[in-house]
């Protein structure tokens, strides 16, 4: 599960920092 989630974390962080 984590191995699928891990690549998404930087993508999510980038998207969130884009919003802010």
Curated annotation (Swiss-Prot):
Q: In which tissues is it expressed?
A: Expressed by the skin dorsal glands.
Question: Where on the chain is Isoleucine amide found, per UniProt?
Answer: 20
Where it mainly occurs, coarsely classed, is: secreted
Where is this gene product found?
Secreted
Keywords in alphabetical order: Amidation, Secreted
Q: Listed GO cellular component terms?
A: extracellular region
Q: Where along the sequence do coiled-coil regions lie? A: none
Q: Describe the function of this protein.
A: Has no antimicrobial activities against bacteria (E.coli and S.aureus) nor against the fungus C.albicans.
Specify the protein name.
Kassinatuerin-2
């Amino acid at each position: 599960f984590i191995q699928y989630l891990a690549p998404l974390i930087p993508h999510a962080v980038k998207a969130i920092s884009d919003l802010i």
